[in-house]
Structure formats: C-alpha cells, structure tokens
Amino acid sequence: MMAKKRIYEVAKELGIENKIVVKKAQDLGFDVKSHMSSLDDKQVSKLVDSFKSANTTKPSTEKDSKNSSRKEKTKIKVSVGAIRRRDNKNDHDNRHGNNKRRNNKFKKQQNDRRAERNKPQTEAKSAARDLLNKFKKKQRAEASELNAQTEASRRKWHQEQNPQRSKVKKVENTRKPKEEKLEGAAAVKARVQASQKPVGPKIIKPSPARNKAKRPTVKKVEPIAPVVPAPQKEETKPTRKKDFTRKKREVPDYERERSEHSDKARRRRNKKNKRINQSKEIKKQPTQRKERPLPETLVYEEGMNAQDLGKLLHREPAEIVKKLFMLGVMTNQNQSLDKDTIELLAAEYGIEAQEKVHEDISDIDTLYTKEMEESKASKHQEKRPPVVTIMGHVDHGKTTLLDRLRHTNVSEHEAGGITQKIGAYQVRIDDRLITFLDTPGHAAFSNMRARGAEITDIVVLVVAADDGVMPQTIEAIDHAKSAGVPIIVAVNKIDKPGANPDHVMEQLMKYGLVPEDWGGDTIFVKISAKTGKNVEELLQMILLQADVMELKADPDQKAIGTVIEARLDKGRGSVADVLVQQGTLKVGDPIVVGDTFGRVRVMTNDKGRRVKKATPSAPVEITGLNDVPEAADKLVVFEDEKTARSVGEQRAKNALEKQRENVQHVTLDNLFDTMKKENMKEVDIVLKADVQGSAEALQQSLEKIEVEGVRVNIIHSGVGAINESDVTLAGASNAFIVGFNVRPTNTAKSQADAEGVDIRLYNIIYKVMDDVEAAMKGMLEPTYEEKVTGNLTVRETWKVSKIGTIAGAFVDNGYVTRDSGIRVIRDGIVKYDGKVASLKRFKDDVKEVKQGFDCGITIENFNDIKVDDQLEAYEMQEVPVK
C-alpha cells in the first residue's frame, strides 16, 4: 500500500502556506478540498515538481509577465529548509524525470487555458501591481540612501569613540552589499552556506515594520546604537541590523498589504492595551479608608478583648492594642481586659464608658411585669373584654349562674354538686364579650380563689339569700380587696322560700360593702340563677362597670398571660388553660410557662373549637409544653424557640436547686426537733388528681390536718391516671395512693393487687380529708366498701328516641348486674358516676351478664357514651368493724 501524505505536511516541507499548496494541487487536477486532504507518492512528486519548476530562474520578458510574477511569488515563499530538502531529493527526481515532464506539460496546458480566460483581468492586475512595485522600490531606494548617509555618519562617530569596534563593523558592512545582490532562493541558499549556524526549516517572512517605506528609522538599519542615554539598546542593535539586511528582499504585494494591515491592527491593540493598563493602574491605587466616628458612649462588659472593643469603637484591633501600649498596658487582641482598663481606654478616646447591665431573662415574673407596663403605656391600645370572676361560698349558685349565662348545664355533672377547678368561659352579650372565671367555693380551694382575684377585672360575689354570709364569702371579699378589684354583689336564690336579701345586705355592710341604695358605692343585684330573674340587669351592671374602668390592651405586642388550670391528657400530653392578658397569642409561638417551655401546637377556645390566635382577655386551651405547668404560672412569648428552651431549662434548674436547699440537714441546733419528728408517725400518701389546681389544693388541705403524734407526708403529687410508677413508689415507701377524679390503669391495678398497695379513689375533696383525718385518729369505721364487680368495653352505641343512648358492651372480666353502680371512664378520667338504668341480653332483660358475653346497657341521666369507653361496675358491700 502506498504511503500517503497530507497537504499541510507537503506545505511544511516546502515552507509554503497551506492555501497555496491546496490551490496548486487543485490546478494540477487533484481531488483536494483542504489542507487535511491526502495525496499519494505520485501526486506528491508532481506537486513538488510543479513548485520546483516554478522556482527555476528564467530570463523574464515583458511578454511573459504572468510567469515572471508567479516565479517571483514562489521564489519568496520558499524557505531555506525547503531548498535544502529539494537538493537532497535530486537523485529521486532524476529517476522519475519522464513522469515529471509529462505532468509539467499537462500543467502548462491547463495554465495556458486559464490564462486565456482571465487574460484581461490579469493584465489589469499586473499593470497595477507593477506601478505599485515601482513606487515602493523608489521609496525603498530613498530610504536606503538615507540609511547609508546615517550609517556613514555613525561609523565615523564610532571610529572616533572606539577604533576597535569600528574595525568589527567594517567587516560586517563589507558583507552587506554582497548579501543585498542575492535574490530569491539562490540568495537565501548562499547566505545559509556563508553562515556558520545551521538554519532550520522556517518560513522567511519580512517584518511588516521594515517593509514600510515611511517607517525605516536608524534603529532598524543601524546594527549598533550610539552610547547615549541607554547603553542596553546599543548591544541589541547589531542583531536588528543583521535581521534587516538578511530579510531585505522582494516581497509579494498581497503579503505586504496583509503585513501593513496587521501592523495597523497591532498598533491599535497596543494603544488599547496601554489604555487598559493605565486604567488598571488607576484602579489599583488604594483608596484611603474613611474612619467611622466614635460612638458617644461605650457600652461595655467586663472581660472584653481588643477585638470586641474595636467593633464597638469602629477601630482596628491593632490600633486598640497600640493605644493600650501607649497607656502602659501590655496586651494582645484576644486577652481579656478588666473594667478599669476599658474605662481608661474610653477616657483616652474622649468618650463616656458605661457598663452593660445584664437582665436575667429566666426571671419571667419581672419580664411579665415589664411587658404589662409597656402595654399600658402603648399608644396602640384597644378596648378589650372584661374578665369577671364569680366567687362565693360553696353551693351558693355560682356555676348555676354561669350555666344560665352560657345556656349550658355544667353544674349537674359536677361531683357532689360542687366546683373543684377553675373554669374559664366567654359569653357574647349585645355584641360585646365578657370572660367569666368560675372558681371553687370549698375551703380547700383558697389558692384558686386568690389566683382568680389576681387576674380578674371585676369580682361578682354570689351570696345565697337563704344562707347569708359564710366563711368562704368573707375569704372571697378579702381576696378581692387585696387585689384591688371592684366587687359586684349578686344576691342569689331570691325565689326560694325563706330568702331574705335585706339580711344579706346588712351582713355585708360589716365588711365594707355598702349598697348604692343605702348611700354606698357597691352595686347589689337581686337575682335568681335558676329562673333567670334579673340576670340581664346583672350583665348590664358588669358592662357599665367595665366602661367606667376603660379596660384596654395592645394586641400587637408579644402575648403574656396566666395559667388558670393545667393537666396531663393521655392523647395530647400537657394541656394548660391560659388567660391571655396582653398581646395576641398565635399558634407556633415559642413560650415559657413557669418552669416549662415549648411551642403552641394546638389552641382551642372554651367551646372546643380550634383557633389560630387568641386576643386579649380570651381564655384558651393550649398544648405543646414539655411538662405540666403549675396553676397561676406566668406565660411569656419569646422571639425564638432556642431562647425559650434555654430560659425554661434554666428555670427548671433553679427550681431544683431551690428544692434541694429546702432540705434540712441534721445539726446540733435542730437535733432535738429532728428526733421528735422521727418519733412521730407519718401517713405517707401518693396523690394523683385530674388537674394541677386540684392536686395543689388537696396537698395543702391534707398537710393542714393536725392530729397529735401523726402527720401527713405527701411523697409525690401529680396529675393524670394512676400508673405503674405510682404503684412502685407507694410500695417502696409503704404508702397508699389517693386518686382524685382519676382511675388506675389495668396494669397498675394488677400490680397494686399483687404488691398489696392500697388505692383510694375519690371525687369529692372533703371526703378525702375526712377519711385521711379519721385514719390518722384511728377512728376510721368502715361501714360500706366499694367493690368493683366487673369491667366492660363499649363496642357500639345506638341512639333511640325517648330512651337515650344504648351502649353495646363486652364484659372483659367479672360481671355486671342490673342494680350495679356504673362509672364511665375515658382516657383514665372519670366522666360520669351513676347507676345502671337497664341491662339486656339480646332483646331480653336480664339481672346479670358475666365475663365473655355481650350486653346492651343504658345509664341513668347520661347519654354521652362513646365507643372504646371503659365501664366499671361496682357494688357497695358492708364491711364489719375490725
């Protein structure tokens, strides 16, 4: 297979541009398109021969101007390397001479035909080119003459300055005329042979600057510059002179024009680059940094370093360090500085130094007071609903009055007919809202009444007309007066026989409550909560009193409030009933409540509907806290959850440390008292209640029971159902468990039976106190004991008119009878305690249903039965006295 070469390789060997070789190959009839086209050996030989025959020097005549111009162009294009390579290939060319002659003949015929077609255009171009060449030759001759004169004057000057160097120049100058006479490829070859250094195969291109007739200068012609301002330029002149003399030859017109064009472009680029560099130099000039003014006051903290002070003073840390060094203080940028040094530095700068006062963000009580004062001073205050607390003695009709206002029936579902936790409700009257707080009237709930008086605007004191002033009535008056809250007296039960409202008014005058009809300033309204008589008048008096007080709040600030009640719910976790006092509480707000923290996850109003925000004076129920807060704890909203978490954790830590400090250790001073206490008998109790307020009230009431030689010790108090941990704690402490409105879980009940732990369950507070006191005195005479006979699970419910709700239940264990007592337990909380109304098996009435069977059951006066409710059947059995 014959080896092939590409066009650019042939052009490289010949030292000719690629496009000229491509053009020549196309003229020879070769199928080539670009410099990447391939040629075989024969085609390469023809192509090289064509260039060789074109380079052969012939006497030019006027008739053959076209051939002479082509020879001149080709002669200039050939490089030294190409000539040398062609000389080395003479033997090869002689062997193939016949083929070359045939190819040259064919090529000549093609050129003749092409010349005939382009003869007019070619003759015009040749004439123009000849005129241009003559003009440029004349310019070069004038430039050469000028250069010769300049060279002679310089040579004379150099001879005077340095005779030895002038001799060397004579030798070089004597060579110059000989080199100028050489032309074309023969001149290049003669110069290469005369030089000592071998010349590589490079294309010889004249410098554009040297081909211009107008730009020949002394620097381009003179090989050695005179020793005037810059001696370095003198050494470079001989090389430039040699290059100029070597390349002083005829150049094709199109290359000369292209060189001139590229020279202009180069000059434009140089000017542009010069401008860019100058602009960059201008930009690089560093701008002077403007110093910021010093602050009027330096608010510092002890322990700051130079970097911290530099930021406050708007100065570099190095400047601060230098200033301190001048003041005699050796320090670095990271070393802490004391108070005196910082004040000395501030005095040096001529500004006042003020130490920063740290606020304890964990003290939310102070923060609560501050927010309250800011809200009162705010200019964006709006009217808010009044908060009214209903107070009075037990069973005087407080909850019945509230039921009348809300059109509900809360009092019938309360154990023993008494309220044992604070309830918060909001009522709309004549397009205005009133928030009511229902407080317990029992003596054990004194703290609840005190909390209700602290967060309220108006106190409605309910006094029964047939009962008169009672101890809790007097206590409520004291709470209201200590809180500075106005009192409106509602004399209730005027519809009952034997009611004497005037007698009640006379009794209240002893405590400073004088009716307006008798010349006083206390509003008295005679009402009947049961029939609704004069209730509307009472509401009008409440609104009138609220208008006089001009109750306002700023809804735009961060919310603050107070916990009314708190409990632990099985499905929702910690639940807190909160009264918003200032600002607007929104879902998602990070909050701290007492020693707990969290984010408001779900918020519901008093009607059980979910809300997104709570405005001032609105009672809401919130979830999302990490633990159950205490009743009366303050609620404060923080900027972010991270801050709220840190504050809550710090408060919990402080509370734990305070609890540890309260533990008394045995010392010589209290040794005798400690021995007396150890000799006393203790009744250990684990107390569990449904809400935090009830647990707190029970604990305080039980601890107040005084029996000589015996005392009550509450080892644990909490909210929620009785669980296994409570039973374990009671078993380890030899205590019994008191459950108030709660029930034990099945696991806890089984564990208590196995370990013999006594669990007492109550739903009325005074029964707890009576039983504990009787047990302490040793006079507990059990007459009847409650015995649980069975447990049922509600699987389906049906509502039947005139009958109520029928529960389809399955007896899990034990049995249930038609005469059994029944409790409805939902999520561990007792919802109702009553009696069985009817018991059926299929369609037949039965007396008893045992374990493993289904039954239909209805409960007296209770229809709110739901699927998965637990029913507990029990009987009261007589227990003999031991």
Curated annotation (Swiss-Prot):
UniProt region (G2), positions on chain: 417-421
Keyword GTP-binding on entry: yes
Region (Disordered): 50-299
PROSITE patterns: G_TR_2, IF2
Keyword Hydrolase carried by entry: no
Region (G5): 528-530
UniProt region (G4), positions on chain: 492-495
Binding positions for GTP per the UniProt entry: 392-399, 438-442, 492-495
Stretch list, region G1: 392-399
Listed Basic residues bias regions: 97-108, 264-277
Pfam families: EF-G_D2 (PF22042), GTP_EFTU (PF00009), IF-2 (PF11987), IF2_N (PF04760)
Ranges that cross the membrane: none
Residue ranges of domain tr-type G in the record: 383-552
Cellular localisation: Cytoplasm
PANTHER family reported in the protein's UniProt record: TR-TYPE G DOMAIN-CONTAINING PROTEIN, TRANSLATION INITIATION FACTOR IF-2-RELATED
Record family assignment: Belongs to the TRAFAC class translation factor GTPase superfamily. Classic translation factor GTPase family. IF-2 subfamily.
HAMAP family: IF_2_B
Task of the protein: One of the essential components for the initiation of protein synthesis. Protects formylmethionyl-tRNA from spontaneous hydrolysis and promotes its binding to the 30S ribosomal subunits. Also involved in the hydrolysis of GTP during the formation of the 70S ribosomal complex.
Protein name as annotated: Translation initiation factor IF-2
Species name: Lactobacillus gasseri (strain ATCC 33323 / DSM 20243 / BCRC 14619 / CIP 102991 / JCM 1131 / KCTC 3163 / NCIMB 11718 / NCTC 13722 / AM63)
